[in-house]
């Protein structure tokens, strides 16, 4: 079977994406927990969240004019650095955890963006779906598995698994090819893609506020992993199920997505396991709608590089607000700051509905 043949490219794409997802999603789950264990303030934990998200809009903007050589480096170099960081963590992390976490968080962004841009150029069919499923499985399972491993054996085995996963991803990466496209003169409407911002807020909030908050309140790692895995599982299942749902208008998807994210504000009043699981599941569905249906709208209204830039920038800036922004607010003003954070998607979803109804209720002769 040819290395560059149709089946070869597809199989290597699945293997590489699954391995990378296993490695990175395992590390990203542990970083806020290690920071809490080492006594870092919420502001410093939020800095790791900033390092995880800020590179996405920056790299996506650079890649709008980048050639194939730079984008291929965007796959190989992050894998080498993440492998090195995982191995370094095996030898201890107490004295140099923060710089390693920031470096690793920064360099994962080019891998995602380079891979997403390359999907349309790889041989084989339905590569986007294969890619989503390949990283979606560890997104749904890694936190739960890593939580159990940490409780039983400690963090070292998470680093060992991550190092092995990045090594596998390196040797299974398909030969990335990038088709040159004519840059689109059309841009997606910001009002339709803005719900991705709120999806980013919840994701950053879950990983960099809820995780350390639960640990500080005595929850075991396997419970924290289960809560995070619930979110990931609903997102992954939503990707599949939404393919069989009758298409709605894009504003309807935006409104539904936004309204499904606001229940997180109830965590300001009481944090119990049933509430956590319910919020993770409901909000996970909202994020899934944003990341699938709104992404499809972006793809249909722009070329690949422009679409990736809009998608990653909108979600990435939301992630910054949900992680660093809420960490700082929580540290200085307390848990009640969750309420205005998640009143925003409620207000925006309501705005989209009222705006549409105001348009449709006008008579043809109305001014």
Q: For the regions a protein language model found, what residue spans apply to each?
A:
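Small-residue (Gly/Pro/Ala) motifs that create kinks and tight helix-helix packing interfaces
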Residues: 32, 141-150, 321-330
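A late C-terminal transmembrane helix in Major Facilitator Superfamily
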Residues: 304-333
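Hydrophobic core of transmembrane alpha-helices in multi-pass small-molecule transporters
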Residues: 18, 96-111, 197, 275-290
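Transmembrane alpha-helices of Major Facilitator/SLC transporters
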Residues: 52-62, 142, 226-247
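Helix-loop boundary and gating motifs at the non-cytosolic
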Residues: 2-53, 187-227
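Structural signature of the two symmetry-related core transmembrane helices
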Residues: 72-87, 250-266
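Symmetry-related core transmembrane helices of the 12-TM Major Facilitator Superfamily/SLC fold
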Residues: 157-174, 336-355
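Intracellular juxtamembrane helix-capping segments at the cytosolic ends
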Residues: 109-123, 288-302
């Amino acid at each position: 079977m040819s290395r560059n043949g149709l089946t070869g490219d597809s199989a290597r794409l699945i293997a590489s994406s699954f391995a990378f997802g296993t490695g990175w999603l395992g590390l990203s789950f542990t970083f806020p927990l290690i920071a809490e264990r080492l006594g870092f303030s919420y502001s410093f934990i939020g800095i790791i969240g900033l390092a995880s998200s800020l590179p996405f809009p920056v790299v996506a903007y650079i890649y709008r004019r980048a050639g194939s050589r730079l984008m291929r480096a965007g796959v190989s170099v992050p894998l080498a650095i993440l492998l090195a960081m995982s191995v370094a963590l095996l030898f201890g992390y107490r004295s140099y955890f923060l710089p390693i976490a920031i470096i690793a968080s920064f360099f994962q962004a080019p891998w995602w963006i380079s891979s997403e841009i390359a999907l349309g150029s790889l041989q084989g069919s339905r590569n986007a779906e294969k890619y989503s499923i390949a990283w979606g499985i560890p997104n749904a399972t890694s936190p739960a598995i890593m939580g159990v491993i940490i409780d039983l054996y400690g963090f070292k085995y998470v680093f060992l698994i991550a190092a092995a996963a990045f090594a596998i991803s390196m040797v299974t990466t398909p030969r990335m090819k990038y088709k040159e496209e004519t840059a689109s003169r059309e841009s997606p409407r910001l009002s339709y893609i803005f719900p991705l911002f709120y999806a980013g807020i919840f994701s950053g909030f879950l990983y960099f506020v809820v995780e350390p908050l639960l640990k500080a309140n005595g929850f075991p790692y396997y419970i924290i992993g289960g809560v995070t895995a619930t979110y990931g599982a609903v997102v992954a299942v939503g990707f599949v199920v939404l393919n069989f749902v009758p298409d709605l208008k894009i504003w309807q998807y935006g409104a539904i997505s936004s309204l499904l994210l606001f229940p997180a504000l109830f965590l300001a009043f009481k944090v119990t396991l049933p509430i956590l699981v319910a919020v993770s599941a409901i909000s996970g569905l909202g994020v899934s709608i944003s990341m699938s249906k709104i992404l499809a709208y972006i793809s249909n209204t722009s070329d690949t590089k422009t679409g990736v830039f809009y998608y990653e920038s909108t979600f990435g800036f939301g992630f910054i607000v949900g992680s660093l922004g809420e960490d700082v607010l929580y540290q200085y003003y307390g848990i009640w700051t969750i309420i205005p954070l998640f009143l925003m998607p409620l207000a925006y979803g309501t705005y989209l509905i009222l705006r549409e109804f105001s348009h449709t209720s006008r008579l043809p002769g109305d001014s």
